[in-house]
UniProtKB/Swiss-Prot annotation:
Function as written in the Swiss-Prot or TrEMBL entry: Involved in mRNA degradation. Catalyzes the phosphorolysis of single-stranded polyribonucleotides processively in the 3'- to 5'-direction.
Protein name stated in the entry: Polyribonucleotide nucleotidyltransferase
KH domain segment(s): 554-613
Gene3D superfamilies (alphabetical): GHMP Kinase, N-terminal domain, K Homology domain, type 1, Nucleic acid-binding proteins
HAMAP family the UniProt entry points to: PNPase (MF_01595)
Gene Ontology molecular function: any one: 3'-5'-RNA exonuclease activity
Alphabetized PROSITE patterns for the sequence: KH_TYPE_1, S1
Any one GO BP annotation for this protein: mRNA catabolic process
Principal place of residence: cytoplasm
Record flagged with keyword Cell membrane: no
Class of the enzyme per the UniProt entry, highest EC level: transferase
Length: 695
């Protein structure tokens, strides 16, 4: 195969696809570029399915090479190691729109690798990475119902921006990524600043319209390359087995899905499944294997639940389609934390804890596009331990899902946080999912808002989140508010919306089918807003403004000193500032502009540090009396240390009212005496003792 290239314009950027020059032994390989950013995408698939395979083993890994930006990796080994959070999030972003486009029944292993090999400091590689994956899969021959397109949308001054640069995003009220086919939107990921439902929906439609040029050109690129499709056919449906399961076990499955408690329901469904396997598996006579019976049992299970929803029957837990599960909201549940909340929605529960730290405890972030490390003063960590779903599992390693859900929660909260200037703390929020039956990330957003207010963080407005679902068959569809885990698994859409009473902060949408219309999205957004306002109303009954009387809240302040006093505060070899920290047990930092940050968990410690900093950095006041120590005696007087690093001269004539012939007759080094400041002359301090003595 020779070298093939295809270039096209998308917005203000030129995108180029190339294949046949690099990575020629991969089943599909595309070098995609936009401006100076270049990404190599490779796809390799297995021609055979592993025996007994019952899921689609697709792996997607996005990798940023530091050489792409002219950097050498930090650390001892000086090579790229474990994936960064950005790499993990982008891997998930790419996986989500392509996974639904592999045909049902295709379970051959597929590996997609995306490697950033040249990086422009203004272009996020994620959009062209998705376009490159779309092209590489389409020319690989692997069964894939693409191509897809993708676009980023910004919004500022009432206008949308297509594929904005990093600089343009700084002033944007929206950062949205949308991906889909020529006819369907498959994935949306967005962060916003309290925008209306209409602005968000119009942005999704705008992106879908704009990436059509990419889909058209990728299709032309595929034709240009010439692709030989794999000889693969979807396995035929065993209609007899499917019919037998429906007739023998359909009613039992239907009754089992009326059990409201998740664990009890799963136990009952498991018992019915075991009975079906015992009744229908007979590999010697009819060839029905355990795996085959399990597969068709799952199909009947899915169709049973979906049909009930479409018929507007009561949902699994007895609710109608627009009702939010019962809420239980508590704050201040942990005695010694800075802020805490326990948010329970049905069988989903999040224990969310806020910790306030000093600015020096910020997370240092190294970005490919930036030459300098950046401080992140807001940390949000989401933990999903196995016990929350009644399972045994490995602990210790942060999973991709936890990173992805944590980022979604962060997006929901970030727009309402005060700036570091308004609130000079590093803020860490941890969400521990203690129970899960759907929508744990949205419970985390509600819990985070409550926990932050309990800690006294002056957030701009309370934030709540809700997960919506969809079941669609032909022209029939039903939108569900506050979906359960089973409704998420058996449905066609996962649509998460978070925001305040004023607007949307975050939206995440994953759609498993084609044919989602603007009407469906409008209804989903309308129901989500109603549910969000309902939840916010109940949250506000518990806590509606920051708790300013929290005894556990650390104390912090920033004081400004003259830049020529920085040296005095630090002292020789850091001696002075280290002494303040050691004596007060507080954290003290000073920057080059003279901003001194003092932080302590204890009021007494904070006050001590504050006074010591002021003693070192403030100029003595004329007429004020100080208690000082004699540090040196000379013929013409004595030098008295009245403040840290500040000595004044007590002239021999100012020691006593009577004539002093010899200083040593009145003072000796180490004596503590009271003195009054007479004058300040170009940094020289003149003192008097005799004015404080009676004649």
């Amino acid at each position: 195969m020779g070298i093939n290239t295809k270039s096209f314009v998308m917005g203000k950027h030129t995108i180029t696809l190339e294949t046949g020059r690099i990575a020629r032994q991969a089943h599909g390989a595309v070098l995609v570029s936009m401006d100076d950013t270049q990404v190599l995408v490779t796809v390799v698939g297995s021609k055979k399915m592993h025996p007994g395979q019952d899921f689609f083993p697709l792996s997607v890994d996005y990798i940023e090479k530091t050489y792409a930006a002219g950097k050498i990796p930090g650390g001892f080994l000086k090579r790229e190691a474990r994936p960064s959070e950005k790499e993990t999030l982008t891997s998930r972003l790419i996986d989500r729109p392509i996974r639904p486009l592999f045909p049902n029944g295709f379970m051959n292993e597929v590996q997609v690798l995306i490697t950033v090999i040249s990086a422009n400091s203004e272009v996020d590689p994620d959009i062209i990475s998705m376009l490159g994956v779309s092209a590489a899969l389409s020319i690989s021959g692997i069964p894939f119902n693409g191509p897809i397109g993708s676009a980023r949308v910004g919004y500022s001054n009432g206008k949308y921006t297509l594929n904005p640069t990093y600089t343009e995003l700084v002033d944007s009220d929206l950062d949205m990524v949308v991906a889909g086919t020529d006819k369907a939107i498959l994935m949306v990921e967005s962060e916003a600043s309290e925008l209306s439902e209409k602005i968000i929906l119009d942005a999704i439609i705008y992106a879908h319209e704009q990436y059509q040029v990419a889909i058209t050109n990728i299709a032309e690129f595929v034709t240009q390359v010439g692709v030989q499709k794999w000889d693969w056919e979807a396995p035929a449906t065993n209609e007899v087995l499917l019919s037998n399961i429906k007739s023998q076990f359909g009613k039992q499955i239907n009754e089992a899905y009326k059990i409201k408690e998740k664990l009890n329901r799963h136990v009952k469904v498991g018992e019915i499944k075991t009975a079906a396997i015992e009744a229908l598996v007979n590999e010697d006579k009819n060839g029905n294997s355990i795996d085959e019976v399990s597969k068709y049992f799952n199909k009947v299970e899915k169709s049973t639940v979906r049909e009930r929803i479409l018929n507007n029957d009561p949902r699994i837990d007895g609710r109608d389609n627009e009702t939010v599960r019962e809420l239980k909201i508590e704050t201040g549940v942990l005695e010694n934390t800075h802020g805490s909340a326990l948010f329970t929605r049905g069988e989903t529960q999040a224990l969310v804890v806020t910790t306030l730290g000093s600015k020096r405890e910020a997370q240092l972030i190294e970005k490919l596009e930036s030459s300098e490390r950046q401080n992140d003063y807001f940390l949000l960590h989401y933990n999903f331990p196995p016990y929350c779903v009644g399972e045994i599992g490995r602990v210790g390693t942060t999973k991709r899902r936890e990173i992805g859900h944590g980022r979604l929660v962060r997006r929901g909260i970030a727009a309402c946080l005060p700036s570091i200037e308004e609130f000079p703390y590093t803020v860490r929020v941890v969400s521990e999912i203690t129970e899960s039956n759907g929508s744990s990330s949205m419970a985390s957003i509600c819990g985070a808002s409550l926990s932050l207010m309990d800690a006294g963080v002056p957030i701009k407005a309370p934030v709540a989140g809700i997960a919506m679902g969809l079941v669609k068959e032909g022209d029939r569809f039903t939108i569900l508010t506050d979906i359960l885990g089973d409704e998420d698994h058996l449905g066609d859409m996962d649509f998460k919306v978070a925001g305040t009473s004023r607007g949307i902060n975050a939206l995440q949408m994953d759609i498993k089918i084609q044919g989602i219309t603007r009407e469906i999205m409008e209804i989903a957004l309308k129901q989500a807003k109603e549910a969000r306002l309902n939840i916010l109303g109940q949250m506000n009954q518990v806590i509606c403004e920051p708790n300013t009387s929290n005894k556990n809240t650390p104390k912090t302040a920033v004081i400004k000193i003259q830049t020529d006093k920085i040296r005095d505060l630090i002292g020789k070899g850091g001696e002075t500032i280290k002494g303040i920290i050691s004596t007060s047990s507080a954290s003290v930092d000073v920057d080059d502009n003279g901003n001194v940050n003092i932080f302590s968990n204890d009021q007494k410690s904070f006050d001590t540090a504050m006074q010591m900093v002021k003693d070192v950095t403030t100029t003595p006041k004329i007429g004020k009396v100080y208690t000082g120590k004699v540090v040196k005696i000379v013929d013409f007087g004595a030098f008295i240390n009245i403040k840290p690093n500040q000595d004044g001269l007590l002239h021999i004539s100012e020691i006593a009212h009577e004539r002093v012939d010899k200083v040593e007759n009145h003072l000796k080094e180490g004596d503590e005496i009271d003195v009054k400041v007479l004058s300040l002359d170009r940094g020289r301090i003149k003192l008097s003792r005799k004015v404080l003595l009676e004649k």
